From Swiss-Prot:
<protein>
    <recommendedName>
        <fullName>Dual-specificity RNA methyltransferase RlmN</fullName>
        <ecNumber>2.1.1.192</ecNumber>
    </recommendedName>
</protein>
<dbReference type="InterPro" id="IPR048641">
    <property type="entry name" value="RlmN_N"/>
</dbReference>
<feature type="binding site">
    <location>
        <position position="219"/>
    </location>
    <ligand>
        <name>S-adenosyl-L-methionine</name>
    </ligand>
</feature>
<feature type="binding site">
    <location>
        <position position="327"/>
    </location>
    <ligand>
        <name>S-adenosyl-L-methionine</name>
    </ligand>
</feature>
<dbReference type="GO" id="GO:0000049">
    <property type="term" value="F:tRNA binding"/>
</dbReference>
<dbReference type="GO" id="GO:0002935">
    <property type="term" value="F:tRNA (adenine(37)-C2)-methyltransferase activity"/>
</dbReference>
<feature type="disulfide bond" description="(transient)">
    <location>
        <begin position="127"/>
        <end position="370"/>
    </location>
</feature>
<dbReference type="GO" id="GO:0046872">
    <property type="term" value="F:metal ion binding"/>
</dbReference>
<keyword id="KW-0479">Metal-binding</keyword>
<dbReference type="InterPro" id="IPR004383">
    <property type="entry name" value="rRNA_lsu_MTrfase_RlmN/Cfr"/>
</dbReference>
<keyword id="KW-0949">S-adenosyl-L-methionine</keyword>
<dbReference type="Pfam" id="PF04055">
    <property type="entry name" value="Radical_SAM"/>
</dbReference>
<feature type="active site" description="Proton acceptor">
    <location>
        <position position="114"/>
    </location>
</feature>
<dbReference type="GO" id="GO:0005737">
    <property type="term" value="C:cytoplasm"/>
</dbReference>
<keyword id="KW-0819">tRNA processing</keyword>
<dbReference type="GO" id="GO:0019843">
    <property type="term" value="F:rRNA binding"/>
</dbReference>
<dbReference type="GO" id="GO:0051539">
    <property type="term" value="F:4 iron, 4 sulfur cluster binding"/>
</dbReference>
Length: 401
């Protein structure tokens, strides 16, 4: 008689697919792991802390290698739990030190996302995805061309950090190569709220990756109600994909603006800052596209918007601007603004006393630059076909070996 596999319930209440009845411990933050150890295993909560450090500090996924656990506890863990990390389909370094991973997600490996590590002077930033694809249809973003497939689980989000940290040899309390995480990869993080917040909790936990709240940044296209909810549940840094300072232009670039126009978005950002003394600024991302949003009048509109935001929060430099040169991708109608236009745009903002940075383009030789992440191909069908070919190639190589 065939064994009936009962789906398990994830921490956010969603049902795990029936391929496994074991609890993936990567799906749990400290609180969830403590509860699992107490309620399911009948073990002391401190045991959860030991396992959490094995997973996130030492990158150990085999319970038998967790040598400070007794044999009986390891047996219970084998019976009720597992640690499933994303499968690395391939990883690709850039000439400038940027590194991109293509990670297969789920038991069948049919979905995949891209994760990018960007080193810089004194810091190393990991750009993490929250969804397979994206449904917001921002016209200048490569990810939008493939449509939306599904949300990532907590395990699949924090698993990206696990893969990168293991590759980098990143160990808390020693020299760090991974110092910052930005939720700026594929997908809209606030549309996968519970899983993203839980994963960010592990990133900031000393038993996890020990990052300060200000070193974890969530970037959103502007889901106003979820920004308000985030204000009550997390103290991470907030970044907003703005890209235009007037509603008419922004609606053509970011369709979500039709539902949450700029005035409502800026009010929610002000509420976010006022919600905690730990928050002192919001970063507004502005992708510069030739002849679209890079003219002097656009810069003056943005400067006025930033001054209004500072006044609303009653704090100087509450709004910071990050100018991003557009990164082209196949099929786009947009072009990158010239260096002269970029510097002229920045000068108008600086002259208006708006704190403004120009993001250095990194990883564009491996399609890892901002706006280029899309699972390597233009749509889901072709993307999944590529995964199958890649995985079949891996199987052939393994068989030959």
């Amino acid at each position: 008689m065939n064994e009936v596999v009962i789906p398990s319930v994830l921490q956010d209440g969603s049902v795990r697919p029936p391929e496994s009845r074991k609890q993936n411990l990567l799906d749990l933050d400290r609180e969830g792991l403590e509860r699992f150890f107490a309620d399911t295993l009948g073990e002391a909560r401190y045991r959860a802390h030991q396992v959490m450090k094995w997973i996130h500090h030492r990158y150990v996924t085999d319970f038998d290698q967790m040598t400070d656990l007794c044999k009986a506890l390891r047996a219970k863990l084998h019976q009720h739990a597992e640690v499933l990390v994303p499968n690395v389909v391939f990883d690709k370094p850039s000439a400038d030190g940027t590194h991109k991973w293509l990670l297969a997600m789920g038991a069948d490996g049919k979905n995949a996302i891209e994760t990018v590590y960007i080193p810089d002077k004194g810091r190393g930033t990991l750009c993490v995805s929250s969804q397979v694809g994206c449904g917001l249809n921002c016209t200048f973003c490569s990810t939008a061309t493939q449509g939306f497939n599904r949300n990532l689980t907590t395990a699949e989000i924090i698993g990206q950090v696990w893969v990168a940290a293991r590759h980098l040899g990143n160990v808390p309390h020693q020299q760090r190569r991974l110092t910052n995480v930005v939720m700026m990869g594929m997908g809209e993080p606030l549309m996968n709220f519970d899983n993203v917040v839980r994963a960010m909790s592990v990133m900031r936990d000393d038993l996890g990756y020990g990052l300060a709240s200000k070193r974890v940044t969530l970037s959103t296209s502007g889901l106003v109600p979820m920004i308000d909810r985030l204000s009550t549940e997390s103290d991470v840094s907030l970044a907003v994909s703005l890209h235009a300072a007037n509603d008419t232009l922004r609606e053509s670039l970011v369709p979500l603006n039709k539902k949450y126009p700029i005035a409502e978005l800026m009010e929610s950002c002000a509420r976010y800052l006022r919600g905690s003394k730990k928050r002192d600024s919001v970063t507004f991302e502005y992708t510069l596209m030739k002849g679209i949003n890079d003219q002097p009048e656009h810069a003056r509109q943005l400067a006025r918007l930033m001054r209004q935001f500072d006044n609303a929060v009653q704090s100087k430099d509450a709004g910071k601007v990050n100018l991003i040169p557009f990164n082209p991708f196949p099929g786009t109608r947009y072009e990158r603004s010239g260096e002269t236009e970029i510097r002229a745009f920045q000068k108008i903002l600086l002259d208006a006393q708006v704190l403004t940075m120009v993001r250095r383009t990194r990883g564009d030789d491996i399609d890892a630059a901002c706006g280029q992440l899309k699972g390597q191909v233009m749509d889901r069908t072709r993307r999944q076909a590529e995964f199958r070919r890649t995985l079949e190639g891996q199987a052939d190589r393994d068989a030959a070996a």
